[in-house]
């Protein structure tokens, strides 16, 4: 298994799909990385040479991925909560942030129903 950005990349998958195992890299960004590294998208990771894998590592290093990206997202949410913005309040209360209805639905965000105590 090749190791890129601290993640074990699956060997038996095509390069484009395998790179999406890294948090912060989707299919579009994965295609851009393959083009920049000069690697065909339909080649499996196990078929790549060590220098091609090194090129992929260099290209991935240009982006904010994995732990840094997770930290950045967490800090931006924390910043919204500290500022007291509407979005921050919604995050703090565990409610939908982007304007969805909450009278019905929103169960994923609100969690399971809590019985009314009498």
From Swiss-Prot:
Gene Ontology cellular component annotations, sorted alphabetically: cytosol; small ribosomal subunit
Function: Located at the top of the head of the 30S subunit, it contacts several helices of the 16S rRNA. In the 70S ribosome it contacts the 23S rRNA (bridge B1a) and protein L5 of the 50S subunit (bridge B1b), connecting the 2 subunits; these bridges are implicated in subunit movement. Contacts the tRNAs in the A and P-sites.
Signal sequence range: none
Presence of the UniProt keyword Transit peptide in the record: no
Domain of life: Bacteria
Keyword Ribonucleoprotein: yes
Keyword vocabulary terms for this entry: Ribonucleoprotein, Ribosomal protein, RNA-binding, rRNA-binding, tRNA-binding
Any one GO biological process: translation
Gene3D superfamilies named among the record's database cross-references: 1.10.8.50, 30s ribosomal protein s13, domain 2
Chain intervals for the UniProt region annotation (Disordered): 92-118
Matching Pfam families: Ribosomal_S13
Subunit and interaction comment: Part of the 30S ribosomal subunit. Forms a loose heterodimer with protein S19. Forms two bridges to the 50S subunit in the 70S ribosome.
GO terms of molecular function: rRNA binding; structural constituent of ribosome; tRNA binding
Name assigned to this protein: Small ribosomal subunit protein uS13
Family to which this protein belongs: Belongs to the universal ribosomal protein uS13 family.
């Amino acid at each position: 298994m090749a190791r890129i950005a601290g993640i074990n990349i699956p060997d038996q998958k095509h390069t484009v799909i395998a790179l999406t195992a890294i948090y912060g890299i989707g299919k579009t960004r994965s295609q851009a990385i393959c083009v920049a590294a000069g690697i065909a998208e339909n080649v499996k990771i196990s078929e790549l040479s060590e220098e091609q894998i090194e090129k992929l590592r260099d290209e991935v290093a240009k982006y904010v991925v994995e732990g840094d990206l997770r930290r950045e997202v967490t800090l931006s949410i924390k910043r919204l909560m500290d500022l007291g913005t509407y979005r921050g309040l919604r995050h703090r209360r565990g409610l939908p942030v982007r304007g969805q209805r909450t009278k019905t639905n929103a169960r994923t965000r609100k969690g399971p129903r809590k019985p009314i105590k009498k």
